[in-house]
Amino acid sequence: METNGFFNCIIKSLCFCALLGLDLSSATSPYIGKIYPGFEGSQMNWVDHNGVFLLSNNSVFALRFYNGLDVASFVLVIIHVRSSKIVWIANGTLLVRNTDKFVFDKNGNAYLENATTVVWSTDTEGKGVTSMELLDTGNLVLVGDNRKILWQSFSHPTGTLLSGQEFVEGMMLKSFPSQRNLTHYLEIKSNDVILYAGYRTPQVYWSMANDNRKTIKKSNETIFSASIVANSWNFYDQNKTLVWQFRFSPFNDVNATWAVVLTAEGSVSFMNLERGVPPRPEPLKIPQNSCGTPEPCNPFVVCSNFDIQCQCPSALSSHPNCMPQLDIPSAGIVKSPGNLSERLLWIVYKNGVDDKIDRGCSSSVPFGRDAVVTILLCI
C-alpha cells in the first residue's frame, strides 16, 4: 500500500509538472537579441506579450505579430517600442491568423505561412545562415559565419526609412492604399528622387531635383543613395560624395532615431521616434502642402494652394456634393455640362491611356483608381 501511495505521488507530481510546462509555453517570454534556426511559433505563443517574440538587445525595437482593424488577422512587423511606431512590415496586406506560424527553419530560411501558402520569405535556404538578430537600429538581419549579413530588412524597406538606413537606387518605398485605393511610391530614378502615384500609367507628382528647399552641395553629380544623418536627409553619388542635403528639422541630435514615412495620402513625413507617443511629424513635409499630392480632395473638388483647402469650383457649386451628372461614353471626349466659367474638360481613358490631353490645363484630378475619367481644370 505504501508503495502504491509513493507511485501515485510521483504520477501526480509528473502531471502537475506537465501542466505547469503547458502554462509556461502558452506565456512564452520574448527572446532578446537573436534566435536560431529551428525556431517557430504563432501569435498565440506570445499573446501575453502583445505578440512580441524578439526584442533588440536594449529593447529599442521589437519583432511582433500585430493586428490592425481586424482583431483576428495579423501582420509581422518591426515596431519602435517607445513610440509604438511600426517601421517595417513583412507580409503587407497578406494577413495571417493567430494560429499561423512564423518559421526560422534549420536550413536558414525565415518565412511566414498561413493555412495554405507562404506569404513572406527571406529566401535564404542553404546560404549558411546561423542566426537571426534584431539590432537596436531597427534592422532585422540574418547572419552567417564571420558575422556576414546574408539578408537584412534595411535592404527591403516597406513604407519607412530609419536613421542610418541606406536607401539606394533599385529600392522602393510603398505606401498603404489611400481611402480611394491609390498607392504611392518613392524611388531613386533617373538621377533624381521621385514620388509617383500608382495609376495604370504612373504619375510623378514630386521630385527632389525641383524642390528648392534642398541645399546643393555638389552640382552635376548622379544620385545613387540617400540616408538620414542627424536632422537632414542626405543624397550621395556612387562614391558616397554628398550631392544634396534636405534639412527637415531644427532639432539636431545625432542620437535621435528619425523616421522618413511615406503616408497613405502620398506625402513624406519626418518623425523623431523618441519624442511623443505617437510621435508628431515635423511641420516640414514633402510635398510642401497637401495640394501637391495626387488626390488631396474628392473628385471634382479643387485644392487651393493659397489656403490649402478643398473647394468646389463655382461652376459646380449648385450640384449636390459638387458632383455633376455625366453621361460618360466608353471612349472619346465628353463635353462640359452647361456654361462653365472655369472651363472643365473631361477626358475619358481608353485602355488605361488618355486619348487627349489639353496641355494648357494647370491641374489634374483623377477620378478614382486607374482613372476612368480625368478632370483637367483650365483657368
PLM ranges: what are they?
Residues 2-379:
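Beta-rich ligand-binding surfaces for carbohydrates and other polyanions
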